[in-house]
Every structure is written in C-alpha cells, then in structure tokens.
C-alpha cells in the first residue's frame, strides 16, 4: 500500500490489514510510507502493517539528511530485507554509510518539527487556493495524512506559472525557469520545481505535475513556514494574477 497523498489513511490501513489477514493469515502487509511520517499520532506498523519503508530526503530526514532510506517493522522481515539488499550473512552489520550518520540522526531528531512546518504550509496553500476558486485535496479543514496538496490548475499556463513561482522563491537556483520535459514512466511531459539544498528533496518546498488535462499540480514540503508562505504566495500570483 502507498500512503502518499492520502492513498491509504491510517484507518484504512487497519481495515485492509484485517481483511487481508482474514483471507490469508500468512500475508505480509507492506506500506510505502513516503510523505506520511509524523503527520499522525500513529505510524502504519501501529495500524496493522508488517513492514514500512520511506525516504530520508522526505519527512524523516528533516531536510538535513542528504540521502538514504529506512526499513522498519517486524524484526524477521527487516533482517530478510537487510540480507537481500546487502549480502547474506552480513545483513545490517556491515555496509556503506557515506559519512552521513550524523546528518541522518540530526535530521531524524528535527523531523517532527519540520513536518509540522510543512503541514502549516499545506494548510496555508489550501486556504489560498480556495480563495482563487480551486479545490485542493485535502482541504485546509480536513485531516492531513501526509504533506502533499494537489489541485487542478485547469490550464497548462497556470500549472507552469505555479511551478515557476515556487522555483523563483526557492533558496537554490531561484533564477531557473522550469520547463516541461519528457520523464521516464510518464506518457506526457512533466514540469517540476525544486530549488532545494538536497537534490530531489520533497520535504523542502517543491511541486510538479504532468502537462495533461486537468493539469493537476502536486505541492509538498516546506522546511519553515515563513519562507514557504512566500513561495506559495508567489506561485499563486504567478499562476493566476500575472496580468
């Protein structure tokens, strides 16, 4: 199951896990936890999942971890993953750390606070988008199971303008103007904006979307609300008030 963008809410994880185990007690419940860490009081393993995985350049890295991922859950399954991803017999005992454990632990320590800033940014964006007539998912008044906000920009110009506004307000490469381009795995061109300190980081303010109707935009992240609010304001202005 995937948790991102509310694909599977906490209460649904428990329901799906119970239903699956009723049909097959030996089944393994696996959850892609990306974008969802620290947004709820419970994590998937507390709601019936056997194994969860995620990325350290998303929520749990706190914007500090430069790379990496995690696997958590049942001890026997984590050990099997370690043997598979490293080497039989070595498991978690040996492996490359890239001299980054300090940044990983520091990022994990800061992560709950950073995720709170990202959710504040999402709520602000949702309010602002509703004021200009959009229908963001989720709404500002709804439960937030992850840090992602999506909305239909309705036109290609609006989607491109929104992404360029996010990029222009970013701390890195703010001079760049994102352009739609082909992307492996997509049938349409995709535009992405991410002026982040860590390449590919989505706990930092970023957005993307495919160039096809209804031109859905996916907005996520925000290391701190003060800077991220400015980014959202500029993005909305660039998309809907250029004239």
Language-model-derived ranges and their functions:
Residues 45-46, 70, 86-87, 164-171:
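Short, solvent-exposed amphipathic alpha-helical segments in soluble enzyme
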Residues 130-242:
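Conserved C-terminal alpha-helix-loop-beta "cap" of PLP-dependent enzymes
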């Amino acid at each position: 199951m995937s948790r991102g963008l509310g694909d599977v809410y906490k209460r649904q994880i428990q329901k799906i896990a119970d239903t699956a185990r009723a049909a097959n007690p030996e089944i393994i419940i696996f959850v892609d936890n990306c974008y969802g860490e620290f947004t709820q009081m419970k994590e998937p393993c507390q709601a019936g999942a056997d194994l969860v995985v995620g990325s350290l350049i998303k929520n749990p890295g706190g914007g500090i971890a430069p790379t990496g991922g995690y696997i958590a859950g049942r001890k026997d399954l984590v050990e099997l993953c370690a043997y598979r991803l490293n080497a039989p017999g070595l498991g978690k005992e040996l492996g490359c750390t890239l001299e980054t454990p300090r940044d990983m632990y520091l990022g994990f320590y800061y992560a709950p606070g950073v995720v709170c800033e990202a959710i504040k940014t999402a709520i602000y964006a949702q309010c602002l988008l509703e004021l200009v007539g959009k229908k963001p998912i989720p709404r500002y008044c709804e439960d937030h199971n992850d840090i992602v906000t999506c909305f239909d920009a309705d036109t290609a110009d609006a989607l491109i303008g929104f992404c360029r506004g996010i990029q222009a307000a970013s701390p890195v490469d703010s001079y760049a103007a994102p352009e739609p381009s082909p992307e492996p795995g997509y049938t349409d061109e995709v535009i992405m904006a991410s002026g982040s300190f860590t390449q590919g980081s989505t706990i930092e303010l970023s957005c993307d979307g495919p160039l096809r109707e209804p031109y859905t935009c996916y907005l996520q992240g925000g290391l701190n609300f003060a800077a991220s609010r400015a980014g959202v304001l500029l993005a909305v202005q660039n998309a809907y008030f250029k004239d």
